[in-house]
Regions:
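Conserved alpha/beta-hydrolase "acid-adjacent" motif
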Residues: 344-350
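Short beta-strand/loop motif that positions the catalytic acidic residue
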Residues: 331-332, 337-339
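Alpha/beta-hydrolase fold nucleophile elbow
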Residues: 236-248
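Hydrolase active-site cap/lid region
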Residues: 259-315, 333
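N-terminal cap/lid segment of alpha/beta-hydrolase-fold proteins
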Residues: 77-78, 82, 120-122, 126-167
Length: 400
């Protein structure tokens, strides 16, 4: 359903009280190895996140060899299939660049799952590096090619990917922000759909993930200001026609930028983005046990804050609330809010907070949907193609 709502009365600020939470035993028990294997295969069979891009028969092959959840063992058995496809890609590169690009992409997808949901061991870090190498192979063989753009942010090198449509002198740009466990390389494959609409994309890891090695904290949004500065200085894209979109945790940054960079954005898409309630201890104590997430949710969420313990994690989150930081009543760039009513990772109440405060906004809510609106039948890709992509193109004034 599509909603547009205006609420002239600001809500009272709700200050979260940190309760006594000292043991991970408070959280739901993680899946056993057998349960995890069964869930992975079920998701692969129906092409569901995070294995939607993996061949179901090859997934079955890997699962037969998966003996434990040890992170290095995990990286090794999944990465072995990536190695197989990488060898094929290298052999194809001299004779069939298009097929080589496709096969490099396939290899990258396996390496990405070998490091999922984060790089927290030697093996998973190696898998991520292999994913970067495979993506580099994809980038140089795909047409049009992908440019790796590097810039400095407070002494830290940040890397993003720019890809431009053919035949468009100064195309508008969509900045796509990775989420908690996804990476800019994943997004760059789906982002190819923008090219057919005359839109360039700049793909970028959110703070605390991938190659954006800065901690999530108030003020980390300034890294996106540097990206906007860099795009504005280029003569091959239109830095005055920019929309930003970020999935899940990346949606937090989309919403933030809709306020902090409203004068430089034509719009912001917020699919399942954390706003306020997500950051509260009571929500996290419930959400960290969700079976909607495959495994390792606490580890992935804690890592982007740079903390290790549950107590430190719960204490850290509230400082990121857009409500408590006074953003919600400020003017904003136009927003498209996307989520499912049954999201167990980010509360639907966060979408309502954005919708009910500040400037008018648009929203697409799936009454049966989980995180970011997805269901078994309505995939992330379908939502992207039918909801997000058309809205972004309209905001940019590009051709449909």
């Amino acid at each position: 359903m599509k909603l547009t709502r205006r609420n002239a009365v600001s809500g009272a600020l709700a200050l979260a009280l940190l309760t006594s939470t000292t043991a991970m035993a408070q959280l739901a028990t993680p899946r056993t190895l057998d349960e995890l294997k069964a869930e992975i295969q079920a998701r692969a069979d129906r092409k569901a996140y995070p294995v939607s891009q993996l061949d179901a028969a090859e997934v079955r092959e890997v699962l037969a060899n998966l003996k434990s959840q040890d992170r290095d063992h995990w990286a090794s058995v999944w990465g072995a299939i990536g190695d197989r496809h990488l060898a094929k890609a290298k052999a194809l590169e001299a004779t069939d660049k298009a097929q080589a690009a496709h096969t490099y992409d396939t290899a990258m997808q396996w390496y990405m799952f070998a490091r999922f949901p984060l790089e927290d061991s030697a093996g998973t870090a190696q898998a991520y590096q292999k994913a970067l190498d495979a993506f580099a192979g994809y980038s140089r063989n795909v047409d049009p090619p992908i440019e790796a753009v590097k810039f400095n942010y407070n002494g830290t090198e940040i890397v993003g990917y720019l890809r431009k449509p053919k035949g468009v002198a100064k195309p508008p740009v969509v900045i796509t922000i990775g989420g908690l466990d996804g990476r800019k390389e994943d997004g760059s494959i789906r982002n190819a759909a923008y090219l057919a609409k005359g839109v360039a994309f700049f793909a970028f890891d959110m703070p605390g993930t991938g190659q954006t090695r800065i901690k999530i904290e108030p003020g980390a949004d300034k890294v996106y200001s540097v990206v906007l500065d860099a795009l504005a200085k280029r003569d091959d894209v239109d830095g005055k026609r920019v929309v930003v979109t970020g999935g899940s945790w990346g949606g937090h940054w989309s919403a933030h930028l809709a306020y902090s960079e409203k004068d430089r954005l034509l719009g912001a898409v917020v699919p399942g983005g954390p706003v306020h309630n997500y950051f509260q201890p009571e929500w996290q104590k419930k959400a960290l046990g969700t079976r909607e997430y495959l495994f390792g949710l606490f580890e992935a969420r804690a890592a982007v804050y740079g903390v290790k313990t549950l107590d430190d994690f719960l204490a850290y989150g509230p400082k990121m609330s857009l409500k408590d930081r006074g953003f919600l009543e400020k003017p904003s760039a136009p927003m498209l809010l996307v989520n499912g009513r049954n999201d167990t990772q980010v509360p639907i109440d966060d979408l309502q907070l954005l919708l009910n405060n500040g400037d008018p906004k648009e929203a697409w809510v799936n009454p049966q949907g989980g995180h970011m609106g997805r269901t078994a039948q309505l995939t992330d890709q379908k939502i992207f193609e039918t909801v997000v992509l058309p809205w972004v193109v309209r905001r940019l004034g590009a051709s449909m």
